[in-house]
UniProtKB/Swiss-Prot annotation:
Keywords: Amino-acid biosynthesis, Aromatic amino acid biosynthesis, Lyase
Pathway entry: Metabolic intermediate biosynthesis; chorismate biosynthesis; chorismate from D-erythrose 4-phosphate and phosphoenolpyruvate: step 3/7
Protein name: 3-dehydroquinate dehydratase
Species name: Corynebacterium glutamicum (strain ATCC 13032 / DSM 20300 / JCM 1318 / BCRC 11384 / CCUG 27702 / LMG 3730 / NBRC 12168 / NCIMB 10025 / NRRL B-2784 / 534)
Active site residues of this protein: 24, 101
PANTHER family linked to this entry: CATABOLIC 3-DEHYDROQUINASE
Enzyme Commission code: 4.2.1.10
Function: Catalyzes a trans-dehydration via an enolate intermediate.
GO molecular function (one): 3-dehydroquinate dehydratase activity
Gene field: aroQ
Catalytic reaction equation(s): 3-dehydroquinate = 3-dehydroshikimate + H2O
Subunit and partners: Homododecamer.
Length: 145
């Protein structure tokens, strides 16, 4: 049975390709999932993807992945800057976690410069567009070796 990576996308990421394309580009969430899935397959891994606009669903997914997945790729969206509960869930999952941001939050508004999630992440990738998801999967695959 191949290892699984949990791919979590937070609030508003279902709007990729439609919302602020000058910041986030024209790629869709489906493109993100396809890219991550293809990269995982190169390493003999599978991806379980979830996008939710509800913090509790993301937390539940992290809890449920504990002990069953090899790692997590997460783009928490706006929860990055506000959610201690999501940080605690990342820690509780005990999964190596890579935080991904399509844009560079440090080149944007001041409130976006802080990430709670990065306190528990093994790596943070920002500003690489959706390629950041591919890089994140590669990082987790190499940690597994």
């Amino acid at each position: 049975m191949p290892g699984k990576i949990l791919l979590l996308n937070g609030p508003n990421l279902n709007m990729l390709g439609k919302r602020e394309p000058d910041i986030y580009g024209h790629d869709t969430l489906e493109d993100v999932v396809a890219l991550a899935t293809a990269e995982a397959a190169k390493h003999g891994l599978e991806v379980e993807a979830l996008q939710s606009n509800h913090e509790g669903e993301l937390i539940d997914a992290l809890h449920n992945a504990r002990g069953t997945h090899i790692g997590c790729v997460i783009n928490p969206g706006g929860l990055t800057h506000t959610s201690v509960a999501l940080l605690d869930a990342v820690k509780a999952s005990e999964l190596p976690t890579v935080e991904v941001h399509i844009s560079n939050p440090h080149a944007r508004e001041e409130f976006r410069h802080h990430s709670y999630i990065s306190l528990a992440a093994v790596s943070v990738i920002a500003g690489a567009g959706i390629q950041g998801y591919r890089f994140a999967v590669d990082i987790l695959a190499n940690l597994k070796k």
